[in-house]
Amino acid sequence: MPLALCCMSHSPLLNLPGPSAELLDQITDAIADARKFVEQFDPELVVTFSPDHYNGFFYRLMPPFCIGTAAAGVGDYGTYQGPLPVDADIANACAESLWESGVDIAISTAMDVDHGTVQPLQELFGDATARPVVPIFINSVATPLGPLSRSRALGAAVGTFLATLDKRVLIVGSGGLSHDPPVPTLATAPPAALDRIVHGAPMTPEQRMARQEAVIKAAHDFAHGQSPLRSLNPDWDRSLLEIFDEGRLSDLDGWTNTFITGEGGNSAHEIRTWVAAFAALAAHGEYQTGNHFYRAAPELIAGFAIRTAVPST
């Protein structure tokens, strides 16, 4: 059961007009380095920890955690649309193992996943369907949210389960870091958006295009200092990366949701995916990190980071 890890930020703006060539070139080079790491490891299975942006999970029933025994990409922001090669047997066995370990997780036999799941797969493999996958959703947007410690417990339990597999497994965490994009909330969403985030009302092509244009404009305004969105926090991002690099995951148990929002923004809670991924790897002992990339990227409305890791022994 050899394990490896790759955590990375995601952004719909990687596939949209707006970001400078200099920024995209730097991120492309960093992703290429991570891709080489993944190619050398040559995983037989990929376990993803990722959020959703009201494309597959909605307030009508919002689990804190969910594992997919079948899944499909919704194709948002130019990402892959269609079924993913989910290993249903392993996903079911993982869920049973989690329940037995005291971590409650929901199951979806028809999980819809968006760019938060699909973009890292496409960037790391060139094709979202290149490897069998077990997708695990972590609610990181729809408040109220559970404590960060529960994401660490989830990851540790998944890591314990992975020890039973005779496969090379890549653990992927997707999201963050400091990050406050324009996401509708129960308190602020206009009627059409409220219907979508609660009931999952489908978007028309015109609505999808309008949302895409709104994201492009929001990023432009943010990058030019003309936005009410919370500023990026590179110091906070680097302190978090240092915790991951040094394996001090238990330090994060004291990070309250209020603290995370105040330091990193409303969508900084996507760091839960990194916490779970690193906890899964740490369940097998000490690890060492590589591919130390970080760039505060206002054009992406994100502190964009990449880390890889392998067990120390």
Swiss-Prot record:
For this protein, the Enzyme Commission number is 1.13.11.16
Tell me the enzyme class. oxidoreductase
**Short name of one Pfam family:** LigB
Q: Which GO terms describe its biological process?
A: 3-phenylpropionate catabolic process
> Which UniProt keywords are listed?
Aromatic hydrocarbons catabolism, Dioxygenase, Iron, Oxidoreductase
What Gene Ontology molecular-function terms does this entry list? 3-carboxyethylcatechol 2,3-dioxygenase activity; ferrous iron binding
Q: What pathway, per the record?
A: Aromatic compound metabolism; 3-phenylpropanoate degradation
Q: Name any cofactors this protein relies on.
A: Fe(2+)
Q: Which InterPro entries match?
A: DHPP/DHXA_dioxygenase (IPR023789), Xdiol_dOase_suB (IPR004183)
This protein's superkingdom? Bacteria
Enzyme active site: 115 (proton donor), 179 (proton acceptor)
Which reaction equation describes what this protein catalyses?
A: 3-(2,3-dihydroxyphenyl)propanoate + O2 = (2Z,4E)-2-hydroxy-6-oxonona-2,4-dienedioate + H(+); (2E)-3-(2,3-dihydroxyphenyl)prop-2-enoate + O2 = (2Z,4E,7E)-2-hydroxy-6-oxonona-2,4,7-trienedioate + H(+)
Q: Report the sequence similarity comment from the record.
A: Belongs to the LigB/MhpB extradiol dioxygenase family.
**Reported function:** Catalyzes the non-heme iron(II)-dependent oxidative cleavage of 2,3-dihydroxyphenylpropionic acid and 2,3-dihydroxicinnamic acid into 2-hydroxy-6-ketononadienedioate and 2-hydroxy-6-ketononatrienedioate, respectively.
Oligomer and partners: Homotetramer.
Report the protein name in the record: 2,3-dihydroxyphenylpropionate/2,3-dihydroxicinnamic acid 1,2-dioxygenase
The protein's organism comes out as: Mycolicibacterium smegmatis (strain ATCC 700084 / mc(2)155)
Task: Give the source lineage, highest ranks first.
Answer: Bacteria, Bacillati, Actinomycetota, Actinomycetes, Mycobacteriales
